[in-house]
């Protein structure tokens, strides 16, 4: 992932502390069923003997894995991540499963840039993620960007505005019941649901069942009203969109959002088509706040 001119952002420090009200690491491991009281005594003794952190002592004794310690540290610092093998989300959510990877560090840099721009223009808190063609990575970027915003402590909403080929309900392992389609068709008020038990600050409004009239539904005033309500309730709202070459859906969504982030894939996205998309968005009054070039 190549993101230009995005300032750096440091990840959560990997250390242990009982200061500032953080919970005890041993208590977290006990509550997770990884240690019992006797094991804690053994770890504490090894910790004092070797002068090493509690987690390192527990791993050294073979009582827990490094992954167990990492998960406990994440809970200790209120930094939600998922353990490998968690069936509640798709592994493509690298921001949840691989928070220390280079790709996720790049996502944090992008998040920092968006936060800075929002500070200058507070209205830019509802952003459509758009692109020219299918397979460029819009859904992946929208989902993982939503995760890193929630990890920052922001109340985050991810809306699947791709009513033709919705992916968010698959990435977050949700059923198709309810969702945006049902709300736009005024058939149900069931909508936003928590993305995962570990991500209390992230809600997802999945698309729902694929309708025969996606563009007409998105053009209804109800959609703009849904986004207006989200602006009041959430710190950041990200909206996934269909590919622009399928129809006018993406531009309708972006116009309702007011801001758009344009996604391209290296060696696949044609520069001319990208320029045409950006120009058409600006003509529709959409603020193009940046571009992301994915290279994986």
Model-based region annotation:
Residues 181, 215-296:
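Conserved catalytic-core segment of NTP-binding enzymes
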Residues 27, 41-45, 56, 71, ...:
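Solvent-exposed alpha-helical segments within well-ordered globular domains of core cellular machineries
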Residues 33-36, 47, 51, 62-65, ...:
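Conserved NTP-handling cores and scaffolds of large molecular machines
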Residues 22-23, 50-52, 120-123, 198-200:
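Short flexible coil/turn linkers enriched for glycine and charged/polar residues
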Residues 139-161:
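A conserved segment at the C-terminal end of the G1
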